From Swiss-Prot:
PANTHER family: EUKARYOTIC TRANSLATION INITIATION FACTOR 3, EUKARYOTIC TRANSLATION INITIATION FACTOR 3 SUBUNIT L. Component of the eukaryotic translation initiation factor 3 (eIF-3) complex, which is involved in protein synthesis of a specialized repertoire of mRNAs and, together with other initiation factors, stimulates binding of mRNA and methionyl-tRNAi to the 40S ribosome. The eIF-3 complex specifically targets and initiates translation of a subset of mRNAs involved in cell proliferation. Component of the eukaryotic translation initiation factor 3 (eIF-3) complex. It comes from Sclerotinia sclerotiorum (strain ATCC 18683 / 1980 / Ss-1). This is Eukaryotic translation initiation factor 3 subunit L. The keyword Kinase does not apply. Belongs to the eIF-3 subunit L family.
Length: 475
């Protein structure tokens, strides 16, 4: 799980050529990297409140502490009970709890650890059910179907958001209005405001783990992905947000947007890694490698020019594999599968498994992998077909079918599907689900009966920008 202790100011708005803002971002990070941890909560003066405050402080601190992956089942159950008790106290007390959280980092760590334990428990429970060998654990899990249940976790996150009125506050800020005017009694307290804010990022993550990628992106409607966003002050939250947004875009076949998200955070990490503590950088290195695998997949579907830093690293990590992905064909299938398995989130099922019929329990990862591989197989011959179409301005359908050794009608169906897939929504502004429909390919065609009309629209490389960028790096 992510356990970063230092944060950086967020990056630029998503402009592909904004190198100046990226440099400013790196400089801002250097200034803030000296953060040494959380400050102690101020003690309440009233002696009658001292014991209660000490108890709350210990519970707040414990909620942010990571649980060992190999912890026994009893410990996982106890951790769930502790979270339920803490969130019940925060949400259902008579009025808002009058405590200041130690820092932004604490609020993120609590939500992050809460979701990590939920994810870990669901994966563990599904694995025990599919194996069907440990009768003692099966009986314990069967008797507690609601422990770390999907409904309970979502209820906590939505309740924190609703209590804090954080969506209303963010909407007011986007309208340049005073957020405190709509915050209410709870939202005016930083404890609720920060927990509510990071619960939105948590919902993005949970909905993505459940496979609802549209709803995952919808949860961020009121959060602007720019350097002023609160999540950008916490490195772990910054990284997590862009990973799950990018992955959701990829699964929705919006590859240009996915590449933009992955590129943004990869450039940010490459420019700040020398200023991060070793433990922090080690903790994000795995996710960093996962993003390179995902961007390799996206570039295979949507060839595009990448930042030189990313392009070089991608060639070093996946040189031969990347070439096979871009060539397509049957030999690319195992590489797509390997990269997806290594880079995807640890998907979970929204319902408890069937302990009585282990063979009926489907691994959520295998389910989403099969959906992804169907898309890969649909586009498998796209590079080969394009290589023929580029040689002509008009071409007979039967002639192309002869080259490819397929039936003409089967080829016609594939061409129509591929043309439809080439029309992608590209994000420009407002919500992450919004955008304008663009042609994602540099090759377009239209069919008139059996005659294929082909047009090629290449975007010339901006040589001036390339020279200026490389001259600046040289001198």
């Amino acid at each position: 799980m992510s356990a970063f202790q230092n944060g950086g100011i967020a990056s630029r708005a998503l402009d592909d050529d904004s190198d100046i803002e990226e440099e400013a971002l790196a400089n801002d990070y250097k200034e803030q990297v000296q953060y040494e941890g959380m400050e102690e909560l101020e003690q309440v003066n009233s002696m009658s409140m001292a014991q209660q405050t000490d108890d709350i402080q210990s519970r707040l601190a414990a909620a942010a502490q990571p649980l060992d992956f190999s912890a026994p089942l009893e410990v996982k159950f106890a951790s769930y009970d502790n979270y339920c008790s803490l969130f019940h106290f925060i949400l259902n007390s008579d009025g808002p709890v009058d405590l200041e959280p130690p820092s932004y980092y604490w609020a993120w760590d609590v939500i992050d650890e809460f979701i990590y334990q939920f994810n870990s428990f669901c994966s563990y429970r599904n694995r025990v059910a599919r194996q069907g060998t440990n009768e003692e654990e099966i009986q314990i899990l069967r008797e507690a179907p609601n422990t770390w249940g999907c409904y309970s976790v979502l209820n906590v996150l939505y309740s924190l958001i609703q209590r804090s009125q954080i969506n209303e506050q963010l909407a007011a800020m986007r309208r340049n209005e005073e957020p405190m005017a709509v915050a209410g009694d709870y939202g005016s307290k930083s404890l609720y405001r920060m927990l509510g804010y990071f619960s939105i990022i948590g919902l993005l993550r949970v909905h993505c783990l459940l496979g609802d990628f549209s709803l995952a992106l919808k949860t961020l409607d009121d959060i602007e992905l720019n350097k002023k966003a609160m999540f950008a002050r916490v490195m772990a939250a910054h990284f997590t947000t862009y990973y799950y947004v990018g992955f959701s875009y990829m699964m929705m076949r919006r590859y240009a947007d996915a590449i933009r998200m992955f590129s943004h955070i990869l450039i940010y990490v490459s420019r700040t890694k020398n200023f991060q503590k070793n433990a922090q950088y080690d903790s994000i290195s795995k996710k960093n490698d996962q993003m390179y695998a995902l961007i390799a997949i996206c570039v295979a579907f949507h060839p595009t020019r990448l930042d030189d830093t990313i392009h070089t690293a991608l060639r070093e990590k996946y040189g031969d594999q990347l070439l096979k992905l871009q060539r397509g064909g049957p030999e690319s299938l195992p590489i797509f599968e390997e990269l997806f398995r290594s880079a995807c989130p640890k998907f979970i099922s929204p319902t408890p498994p069937d302990f009585d019929n282990p063979e009926l329990n489907v691994d959520p990862l295998e389910h989403h992998l099969s959906i992804f591989m169907d898309e890969v197989k649909t586009n498998m011959w796209s590079p080969t077909v394009k290589s023929y179409l580029r040689l002509y301005t008009t071409m007979d359908l039967k002639k192309l079918a002869g080259f490819l050794e397929v039936e003409p009608e089967k080829l016609r169906g594939w061409l129509l599907v591929n043309k439809q897939r080439s029309r992608q929504i590209r994000w420009t502004d407002n919500g992450l689900l919004d955008g304008e429909v663009v042609n994602s390919n540099d090759l377009d065609y239209a069919m008139q009966g059996d005659l294929i009309h082909i047009s090629e629209a290449k975007v010339g490389r901006k040589l001036v920008d390339w020279y200026l960028r490389n001259l600046a790096r040289t001198y």
